A protein has these predicted regions:
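ATP-binding/phosphotransfer module of carbohydrate and carboxylate kinases, centering on a glycine-rich
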Residues: 1-61, 82-85, 105-111, 154-293
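ABC-type ATPase nucleotide-binding domain
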Residues: 68
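Phosphate-binding/catalytic loop of phosphoryl-transfer enzymes
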Residues: 71-168
Length: 293
């Protein structure tokens, strides 16, 4: 008998298997989980691979799926169909990636802010009430994210090219990253159907590098991003009455030491106590499976 937690991401899917006494047995990794990116057929194939790796699904007592976009009704239908087909008869649940991230980050009430390609914040108070802010996608939201920083770098570059702003160093760095020399090449890259939000987010590194070198436009971009993440956290705290709580920093942009993380920590210290997560999101998914009633 066993339980399982699944952390489904845009680039890979991870599963943690534990025995029914909550002891870790193993972890495995598979391909991307996002049905919008890979399509329904590939999503079903992924699930079958994951379930096959578990062994006899009839022996699985509980399973928790955590992923962005998992509230999509069609995703729920497919999960149920594939679980049934695999012989699963236990209990299961699905929740957002922010929920498993928070559960992995801390055992106490608090807030987790995630800044990777996108951004989102999620919190839980003593009463068990939860709230989120952000996470509405790169077209209308994702402030403080890698996408937002990358977009602002490219924007500052073309403004500098026109003489509408400083940021000449950013322009040079954008040219170098694209192996380009004209504004037309920048525009062609940005609006190409092959350029997704992850490609734009790669330009966030320019902001970090240039800010570390003292470039003022880059520093301003990072400060705006830190303020956006601060606003995400404040919104959740206000709704949950969670003043001066632990705040876990998660996601590729702020989970390890860099100039942007320092700016974010400075802003978040006005609201609570920034902390490193105790465990990762996959641990959180498996723990939520174990705690399922």
């Amino acid at each position: 008998m066993f339980i399982a937690g699944i952390d489904g991401g845009g680039t890979h899917t991870r599963i943690e298997i534990r025995d029914i006494e909550n002891n870790l047995l193993r972890r495995e990794e598979f391909g991307p989980f996002n049905i919008n990116s890979i399509g329904e057929d590939a999503f079903r194939k992924l699930l079958r691979e994951v379930f096959a790796s578990c062994g006899e699904m009839a022996d699985c007592k509980k399973i928790c799926f955590g992923a962005a976009g998992i509230s999509n009704p069609r995703v729920g239908e497919i999960l149920e169909e594939e679980l049934n087909a695999a012989g699963f008869v236990g209990k299961w649940k699905r929740c957002g990636d922010q929920e498993i991230a928070l559960r992995g980050a801390m055992d106490t009430p608090g807030v987790a802010v995630i800044a990777g390609t996108g951004s989102i914040c999620f919190g839980k108070n003593e009463a068990g009430e939860t709230a989120r802010s952000g996470g509405y996608g790169h077209l209308i939201d994702d402030g403080g994210s890698g996408y937002a920083l990358g977009r602002d770098v490219i924007s500052a570059a073309v403004r500098a090219l026109d003489g509408r702003g400083q940021g000449k160093a950013l322009l040079d760095a954008v040219y170098a990253q694209l192996n380009a020399s004209t504004s037309a090449q920048i525009v062609s890259f940005v609006y190409s159907p092959n350029t997704d939000k992850s490609a734009i987010a790669e330009f966030a590194r320019i902001a970090l590098d240039q800010a570390a070198a003292g470039e003022e436009t880059a520093r301003a971009i990072l400060n705006r991003g830190a303020e956006e993440l601060q606003a995400l956290v404040a919104a959740v705290q206000n709704r949950l009455d969670l003043a001066d709580c632990p705040i876990a920093l998660l996601g590729g942009l702020i989970s390890s030491e860099n100039i942007y993380r320092r700016a974010v920590v400075e802003k978040l210290s006005e609201l609570g106590t920034p902390i490193a997560p105790a465990h990762d999101a996959l641990w959180g998914a498996a723990q939520m499976a174990y705690e399922m009633e």
